[in-house]
Amino acid sequence: QPQPNWCYISSGTWSLMGVELAQPLVSDQALAYNFTNEGGVGSYRFLKNIMGLWLVQECRRAWRLQGRDFSYAQLSGLAEEAAPFSALVDPDDETFLAPGDMVAGIRAYCRRTEQHIPDSEGVVVRVALESLALKYRWVLERLEEILGRRLSVIHIVGGGIQNELLCQFTA
């Protein structure tokens, strides 16, 4: 039976990225990269949990607490206008797990890793979105390595599909 050439991303506050398989996949590689198996009806989802739009949601909350209220569309627009790849963060770094001032967290991560420190809302959001898209790329490459085959299609579902900029970066 031919194996599908696609994977999925369930995109929202958190992201799940993986493939559907007939049997669970258990290997040293899967363990090393922190993949898991979830049983479903007639299949198993072999996947990895990834930070999602939590980064942007928490930045938005921090700005709102400072009296600057942005819609997600406004934040995406500002990010689209910002210069690309001014800095990158690992979205799964423990710095970003707890609620709080995510703007300060992103800036602190950039300072700690000796990168450009984002200096505007647009740059902060662009750093978050580009970093998330590159994390998706990293997970895709690990999936292909573990499966031993190329995955040429990504199906994205969930509330995160409303963020067209993230979807474009992911493509």
Give the role of each language-model region:
Residues 1-154, 162-171:
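Active-site core segments that coordinate phosphate-bearing ligands/cofactors
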Residues 158:
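Small/polar loops that bind or transfer phosphate-bearing groups
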